[in-house]
């Protein structure tokens, strides 16, 4: 049998695919063994495709440090472990590496720690014993959320993660008032959603759809932002439109029809519409879904800008690289319940938890565990910095010693071909 997949996630390709075809401008650019194709970094980046995290790391550390036996960069965690630390320790011994910038794992019971940290502060969002579901033809009633209790505070960057059907999008809709819980209460900024119309809640809470094209009703992005502001009763609409276009770097899209733009452009413009009224709470459903490398960077940049204007941001996402690098609180949902509520390091360092929630551990976290880092490393930049600093430290001779100590890192001189 032959299985053909259309896939942007290069880690999946590295683990499961034998061959790789790059399609560009309506034609086949090349066909290569997957390990070779994932090493054609210039070609991948030209098409805005993320190479695997371990490949990005190998490309960024000092030349020759992280190549495998045939001279290419690693594409899987197994290959990266061998390439980086093949000579680091005797068989069966794991090296312990202090990691500057890494995050110490914490308890999965984030709520108790957060209660102590927040003291007597009032939560921005409160859910108490929330149950919700939908009627189905086969099962009668599908319980999506069951007895959910959560408190979210100002300053939280919250990521809801879990498999399809775990309740992420349902939870976001409950927070907007677009749906009412079958059981329990949902309160946003002290107001129960059952006691308010969705348009009243929209004064302070903005929901940015998973399908961004649903947010465009006018024939230009400029008019769409103005339309939303007028409907919210905003003052000085024209100057506010120009302000948001400039602040979020949307000027190039301002006079284009949002319905005819690419998905990445639509996502950026929809964020402009949602952030125009300076909301207190922003809810985003799959903000980087179906985006290429460049669009993902642009959307992530807008999210970071929003932090200075918005009290609480909640995203539902399958993009665990985004979650690891952006969120400070990760809520893992599974079959209507909270499996974990903790900082990213604690969540992504727990292989058993991830398996129970049907989530894949980011390559960089798995690699930091394999290499014996004291704490999980959450981003490729942090891993590159840690490896580079460790190498420089190990390579510095002690006083009175004429030779540098063994770094524990293979000093291979193999380099990649010009195709890179």
Segments from the language model and where they lie:
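ABC ATPase C-loop
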Residues: 274-275
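Conserved ABC ATPase "signature" region
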Residues: 235-253
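Helix-to-loop junction immediately C-terminal to a conserved catalytic motif
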Residues: 176
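Conserved ABC ATPase signature
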Residues: 257-261
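ABC ATPase nucleotide-binding domains
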Residues: 44-123, 354-420
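Conserved ABC transporter NBD signature motif
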Residues: 184-192, 201-202
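Catalytic Walker B motif of ABC-type/P-loop ATPase nucleotide-binding domains
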Residues: 282-285
